[in-house]
């Protein structure tokens, strides 16, 4: 887990700053799912850090089999949009069918359901 100090983006020595400044860094995931074989569509949610997904999301997509699956990123953000998120995630899992993501800040449950249904 990340502490408040880990997430202090104003401190260039914080854990999140160090991770995001090294694009090759891949934090470990405690436990990956056994299989995603029963799913055709995968939603992946995360906060936007520095206009992209945190590098742990790259860890995830590089270590699960998403080939041929529709992958839909969604995010929260303190002020930016999706930025270069999709461009940064695609090389980590080129076999997935990536769909343009969406920032979902403040969306009502109905608006979120409507968005997901259209995908």
Please place each PLM-identified region on the residue numbering:
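N-terminal beta1-alpha1-beta2 submodule of the flavodoxin-like/Rossmannoid cofactor-binding fold
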Residues: 1-44, 51-53, 58, 62, ...
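Short, surface-exposed connector motifs at secondary-structure boundaries
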Residues: 40-42, 67-72, 98-99
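Short glycine/serine/threonine-biased micro-segments
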Residues: 43, 66, 77-79
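Gly/Ser/Thr-rich loops at beta-strand to alpha-helix junctions
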Residues: 47-52, 77-81
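Short, conserved loop/helix-junction motifs that constitute active-site signature segments
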Residues: 62-68, 92-93
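Short, glycine-/small-residue-rich phosphate/pyrophosphate-handling segment
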Residues: 72-108
């Amino acid at each position: 887990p990340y502490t408040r100090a880990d997430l202090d983006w104003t401190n260039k020595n914080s854990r999140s700053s160090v991770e995001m400044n090294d694009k090759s860094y891949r934090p470990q995931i405690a436990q990956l799912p056994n299989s995603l074989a029963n799913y055709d569509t995968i939603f992946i949610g995360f906060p936007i850090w520095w206009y992209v997904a945190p590098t742990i999301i790259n860890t995830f997509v590089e270590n699960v089999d998403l080939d041929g699956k529709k992958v839909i990123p969604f995010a929260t953000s303190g002020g930016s949009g999706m930025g270069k998120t999709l461009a940064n995630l695609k090389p980590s899992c080129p076999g997935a069918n990536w769909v343009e993501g969406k920032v979902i800040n403040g969306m009502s449950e109905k608006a979120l359901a409507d968005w997901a249904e259209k995908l």
